[in-house]
Amino acid sequence: MNYGLTHTPSLNMSECLVLGVFSDLALPDFATAIDNEQQGLIKKLCQRVPEPGNTVWQTDVEGHSLLIIQCGKKEGFSANSLQKRVGEITEALIKQRFSSATVCLPRLNQESSEWQLEQMIVQIDNLRYQLLDFKTKHAKSHKLESVIFHLPGATEKSLEMAKAIVSGVEFCRDLANMPANICTPTYLGEQAISLSKQFDQISCQVMGPEEIKEMGMGALLAVAQGSDQPPRLIDIHYHGNKNSAPVILVGKGITFDSGGLSIKPANAMDEMKYDMSGAASVLGVIKACALLKLPINLIGIIASAENLISGSAVKSGDIVTTMSGQTVEIINTDAEGRLVLADALTYAERYNPDFVIDIATLTGAIIVALGNIATGYMTRDEQLAKSIERAANESQDKVWRMPLDEAYQDALESPLADMINAGFDRSAGSITAACFLSRFTEKYRWAHLDIAGTAWISGKKRNATGRPVPLLIQLLRHVANSR
């Protein structure tokens, strides 16, 4: 996909000129000039779009097309309005099978041109994204290949930033959408190594079962023991500032989750290929950071395995010793994500991080609580919470803070081990899962993102979303600017 900027939009710049207009303001100068050339055509068309979101097409204007979209009154043109208009425009362009367009939307009142440009590009790229295709007979495909923006105040720098973000999001989505027979723990490791070969500032180490055993990662090994696919611990570094403490992102990389002996229902089990979306987001963020050349140190740690059923699979009631030395009684084999994360979070201690954020499709309970709009997050660190909230607001990648009160820890008590891996009832499932993780994060500042509701769209049109890559990149940009 090609994105560009122009100061002088015209009809012949692309297949379609898209013009957003206000109901209470005159046309901008460039549109007035085009209107005069076309004998008042634009003003006539504007009369046919009285309400926000109304559109009108005019084809064969000097061999090109013109799309007018009503944006309402200037005072009411908000970030939410922008999102709606961009969505309507993108869907219209794709439906009409245009390959190129010049988009001229008004400036927002409260946001910078740089921010607006990033949001438009991220949204257009999300909507034009096409699933990986394994069909043997291909329908003739069509893509929107080029969009040029007219947005006074936007710069080439902001354009390049937006392109880096969508590159990271696309990489995340491609990995998450991959079928589990292809995207195995080994494949994830290979993708991380591939990134290190693409960028000089990235290095990578991928560890297998023997190294994992030597480090005492009993929880990760327990989850993996039911599968023929060997587990992987992926340790990938982006070296952007050798003098600063690293930020660490820990990703859950369960490439397929049957639930183990606590087996999941058959309905929609195919979507459990998305249980490695946390790992995919970590790799997507690292790729974007390398493209942006952010002056930070960033480490991605991914604990990857399959959670399957076999004669050697871990059983309910088994007790394992984690890398931290703490013991866990496995009450539910379908609460496996927190087990692999426990060892990965302990592994993170060696780097003396500034802070750690884990990203995981961890609980169905967070979907019950928040649906697919906001990612649930938990932390005890108020400064980190403020940073996450700020980044979420700026990136439009929504979050909602959930409690992490000490009283919830009681649900994890075990008569036989230091803790159980899941509560005996279904109450506060996302909170008690975070409480479990908190027991492995006492040596650094930490936050947990539960993306089970936001990492993919379920059903017939199932598709990875690429979240929370935009949120995390925005957070890291603030970290970079503070150093």
UniProtKB/Swiss-Prot annotation:
SUPFAM superfamilies (alphabetical): Macro domain-like, Zn-dependent exopeptidases
Annotated compartments: Cytoplasm
Binding-site residues for Mn(2+) 2, renumbered to this chain: K252, D257, D275, E336
Residues in the signal sequence: none
Chief place of localization: cytoplasm
Catalytic machinery residues: K264, R338
Gene3D superfamilies: Leucine Aminopeptidase, subunit E, domain 1, Zn peptidases
Keyword terms, alphabetized: Aminopeptidase, Cytoplasm, Hydrolase, Manganese, Metal-binding, Protease
Swiss-Prot/TrEMBL cofactor(s): Mn(2+)
A GO term for molecular function: manganese ion binding
Cofactor binding note: Binds 2 manganese ions per subunit.
Enzyme Commission no: 3.4.11.1, 3.4.11.10
Binding-site residues, Mn(2+) 1: D257, D334, E336
Cellular component per GO, a single term: cytoplasm
Enzyme class: hydrolase
Reactions mediated catalytically: Release of an N-terminal amino acid, Xaa-|-Yaa-, in which Xaa is preferably Leu, but may be other amino acids including Pro although not Arg or Lys, and Yaa may be Pro. Amino acid amides and methyl esters are also readily hydrolyzed, but rates on arylamides are exceedingly low; Release of an N-terminal amino acid, preferentially leucine, but not glutamic or aspartic acids
Function according to Swiss-Prot or TrEMBL: Presumably involved in the processing and regular turnover of intracellular proteins. Catalyzes the removal of unsubstituted N-terminal amino acids from various peptides.
NCBIfam families linked to this entry: PRK00913.1-4
Family statement drawn from the similarity comment of this UniProt entry: Belongs to the peptidase M17 family.
Stated name of the protein: Probable cytosol aminopeptidase
Organism (species): Legionella pneumophila (strain Lens)
